[in-house]
């Protein structure tokens, strides 16, 4: 059996019907963490290291995913097929690794589909891939640039 994570609860409900009882489909409800709100969340002097914090409103979603993974041996990240979706998958994987929610034997896959139809979802499940790190890096560059420059822009 596998745990599938999508972004929205409505998608989770529909996709669960398509995949059946061999899958547990849960929603992240968007991003699960963001840059810390304090100064220094991005450190240019330390290779632009970023300090992330989990969104307090997403704790129950993360707990549900962690709990589901305790009984399963596969994680399928099925967030949206864009830069933000790729970033959400990356954030989820990082959080789950830090919480030690993934066993050494847990397979992690990334799937994408452009429509919430049975055919699209089932076809995507046949074509898993890894997280697209260039997309994640584009997201990280945008987030760090915004964090570092927004206070300056607001002062002008």
How would you describe each model-predicted region?
Residues 1-144, 148:
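Intrinsically disordered, low-complexity regulatory segments
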Residues 147, 152-156:
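Single conserved hydrophobic/aromatic residue that forms the stacking wall/gate
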């Amino acid at each position: 059996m596998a745990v599938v994570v999508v972004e929205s609860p409505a998608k989770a409900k529909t996709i669960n019907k398509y995949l059946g009882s061999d899958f547990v489909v849960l929603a992240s409800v968007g991003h699960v963490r963001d840059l810390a709100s304090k100064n220094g969340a991005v450190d240019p002097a330390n290779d632009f290291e970023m300090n992330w914090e989990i969104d307090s409103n997403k704790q129950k979603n993360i707990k549900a995913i962690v709990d589901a993974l305790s009984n399963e041996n596969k994680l399928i990240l099925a967030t949206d097929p864009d830069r933000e979706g790729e970033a959400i998958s990356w954030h989820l994987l990082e959080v789950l690794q830090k919480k030690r929610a993934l066993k050494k034997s847990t397979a992690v896959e990334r799937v994408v589909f452009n429509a919430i139809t049975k055919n699209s979802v089932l076809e995507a499940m046949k074509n898993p891939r890894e997280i697209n790190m260039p997309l994640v890096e584009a997201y990280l560059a945008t987030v760090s640039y915004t964090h570092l420059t927004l206070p300056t822009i607001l002062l002008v």
